[in-house]
Amino acid sequence: MRVYDAVTRIGGIKDFEFKDIISCERPDRYRNKAQFPIGRAKDGSAVFGFYSFHTHRIIPCDDCLLQPEAFNSVIEITKRFIDKTNADIYDETTGKGRLRHLYMRLGEITDELMVCYVVNGNGLKQEDELVRMLKDGLPNLKSVIINSNREKTNVV
């Protein structure tokens, strides 16, 4: 009824056929792309999530129900890599640090996984170790990309 009301009242359309709404077959885990800024929590641990409105503060997201579960595995492996290598994480306020964003795609039909890291500079220290960890933990991994963004912005 809300849709009908919006179309007639807001849209000004009076004469149309209104059919029943068909619900989504898969209300969760239907997205095939995700991107997360990477930062540090107050305790120093790596945090992946979303920016709080109009801030550089990252709200942690351990499991977004819109995204494939495989993305959680990528995040966990990346956290282990950061802990193991003490990887330098980018700080939005100072513009210093290396590892900025994690971007992922999953092929719905092929189940192939693409992982992209956005870094401040050229490459990533010990990136061979990161690739090894990803390959060991993700049998459907198809590609790993290191993308350089040196601009002082949180735009990927």
Question: Where do the model's predicted regions map?
Answer:
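Accessory RNA-recognition modules of RNA-modification enzymes
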Residues: M1-V156
